[in-house]
Amino acid sequence: MKTGKKIAVLALIFVAAAIIYFVWPLGRKEENKTGVVYTAMGEAELPVVYPTALGRELAPLFGHREELAVTAERDSLLVLPEDRRLPIRIQYGDEIKTLQYEIRTMDMTHLVERTTVTDWTEENGQINAVLPVQNLLEPETQYQLGIQAVLSDGTSAWYYARILETDNDHAAQMLALAEDFSQKTFHYDSAQELTTYMESTPSADNSSFGTVTLKNSFTQMTWGSLGVSRGETVFASLKELSGDLANIELEYYVTREADGGAGGTDGGETEVYGVTENFTLKWSSQRIYMMDYERTMNQLFSGSRELFSGKRILLGISDGDGLYAKKSESGRYTA
């Protein structure tokens, strides 16, 4: 087989793997202001549910074909609004015929509520609904929420999250701080305010943007000379909330125009990176403390010829984790 054909095969394999790894967690189809469209695979072929809590629309919930019988995923924690009415938006919802939800204790042994949703509207394939959670929950106690969407073919899609009823708005304040911190890293002047949280040390590794923490330099935190631009869509999720301590995650894409430097890419080619920021925050009446922070960055492999050097593949910026191999259908090539 000619070298050109080998490169084409390897490129196709890596593009497929990269799409699954980077784009699946960020939704089936998202478009940012750069005009680049990303499409995910697999479970996201089902309708996608976007809950609203803490004053904003949060990261999407992806559907499962089967009801989870034992425990729910711990990816998302939703703090209920004061009236316990939880708004959701369902993308690609034109396949949905009926919608209901159930609430169980976290050990799944006790059914607290099961309700058919009637308060919903549909327009252009998108559903806006409200889950009218009843006054049956113990405050400051997490429960398992399962949303069942019955589709036009008679099958069901299940969506899971944890829910919590609380009297304080500390989580919303901490989410606002995380979003503000993230936004300011893209603006050098306003980012000066972030030095309050930083703990820069000479021993920190400032040689790569793959992983950045509070111990890195200010230049590293503010993207150095990369010249990246963030897309308009930022997915936020509350991972944990225990008293005044919260763990929050932001996911988004950044793009940059390649300059033809390291990596051999031609000028003008748009490079795309998946970015995840994780914050551990502690609320107090005086201020919010940042207990831990980590930003990881992975380049989305495009498969262009410039990213191949002989038998090597130039993967660009990466956090050093999550590199997988995949074989071609014939089993002859591994990438």
Residue ranges and their predicted role:
Residues 40-101, 109-111, 142-150, 154-225, ...:
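Core segments of small alpha/beta cavity-forming domains
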Residues 26-45:
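Ser/Thr/Pro/Gly-rich low-complexity linker/stalk segments immediately outside membranes or between
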Residues 92, 151, 252-256, 285:
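Beta-strand elements of well-folded, non-transmembrane domains
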Residues 27-31, 71-87, 96-124, 129-147, ...:
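Surface-exposed, charged secondary-structure patches
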Residues 234-239, 276-282:
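Hydrophobic/aromatic beta-strand elements that line small-molecule binding cavities or substrate pockets
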Residues 164, 291-302:
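Short, solvent-exposed aromatic-acidic interface loops
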Residues 83-84, 106-108, 241-245, 281-288, ...:
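Short, solvent-exposed coil/turn segments at beta-strand boundaries
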Residues 1-15, 23:
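N-terminal Sec-pathway targeting helices
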